[in-house]
């Protein structure tokens, strides 16, 4: 009887148990948020995290790690969470899709040491009214299409001076430091736009000192620094970046303040009723904004803005021309093609003008190929997440530092055929430009943080390069063969050749 009773109750017990299981599993509250994983990354050591995995060229280290951990990976540098993206798709997410969330910066220890992060258009967050003012001034008074067109003759004249200097070196059969010569050209272009004066002189060592100072700024900002990962070490300045940046920036500030003081003195002496026939430059516009009870700027703001503009307008342009010349000397057949195109278009006119560049597609391809292999800022300027954000299915937490490794994207064999080869032909017939719309080639960044100096760079670099190729043939000094040309890099905010390129200009018959 008991057995029969148990047999009868057992199915009922199972039914009731099943009912409660189904009821509680289907009616209990569930989290509305899905669990989003962090990007994959290498194992971390206590305290230092992944610092030990980064060598003297972080863009190389990140590229190697991405082969194991994928196009979006997570790293830890001391106390600093870092995400590195290494594909066009991931770059689009960071630079465009989530541009607003990922548009702040994490100032470096050296930048904070001169309070540059509080006034700089590079380091201020876009939510800042000061950033919006400085960005607007740069866009409308410096780099607008109208201003770029208005300074065309200036750029052409400064490049003519470069060619003249090269001609003198050619007559003496002397090798030229390409980096230094093109830096002086870029320096005089930007200094005339800003101050209406030349700051560089091809026959003076002072120009070399100025270049070394600008490079010192870029390296002090871009070099690895223990205090960026462990803020409590900042006062020790273990790598010397704070000391270097303070010394270099103060030398530049002294130059800038000298021009500002001279302009203010000139302004005070000038009769307000007299007609000012001198063409106004950018600093004149800035000084107008320092006047009155509701002044929008002060002179300290101006010198810090000028520091940003000199870095963006000189070192990056000259280093790109140097890399282009180095690649052409390593690939003589490519140089011959570029020169043949230029000779065909320019003929015996004797000079390359900016209006000629649009008729030189192969030259433009050479410039793009140079930016692909040697982007001026290989990791761009790192961004910071203002809030948690999901990128390609992975969670990027608030305050994470985000790098876009444009150097690695430019050499990705999944994106580029024969990715390590210098081959300008890959761009012919393709609508790929440098203006932040094609994420396989974004050397200037994209979105609201795109480099404001891009319009000037895309005019200056091709003009300098075309003029050098039109007026001269080129050879390496001391019998060095093209296959022996050193292409080592030195990492900083700007990517330089470790050993500056020296080449001998050989004047073409009937030129200059």
Swiss-Prot record:
Segments passing through the bilayer: 3-23
EC number(s) on file: 1.14.-.-
Topology in the lipid bilayer: Single-pass membrane protein
Amino-acid positions noted as binding heme in the UniProt annotation, renumbered to this chain: 451
Keywords: Heme, Iron, Membrane, Metal-binding, Monooxygenase, Oxidoreductase, Transmembrane, Transmembrane helix
Highest rank taxon of the organism: Eukaryota
Gene Ontology cellular-component annotations: membrane
SUPFAM superfamilies listed in its UniProt record: Cytochrome P450
Subcellular location: Membrane
PROSITE patterns membership: CYTOCHROME_P450 (PS00086)
Cofactor(s) it depends on: heme
InterPro entries on file: Cyt_P450, Cyt_P450_CS, Cyt_P450_E_grp-I, Cyt_P450_sf
Signal peptide: none
CDD domains, per database record: CYP76-like
Any Pfam family hit: p450
Gene Ontology molecular-function annotations: heme binding; iron ion binding; monooxygenase activity; oxidoreductase activity, acting on paired donors, with incorporation or reduction of molecular oxygen
Swiss-Prot/TrEMBL induction comment: By ethylene, abscisic acid (ABA), wounding, lead, dark and infection with the bacterial pathogen P.syringae pv. tomato.
Family: Belongs to the cytochrome P450 family.
Designated name of the protein: Cytochrome P450 76C2
The encoding gene: CYP76C2
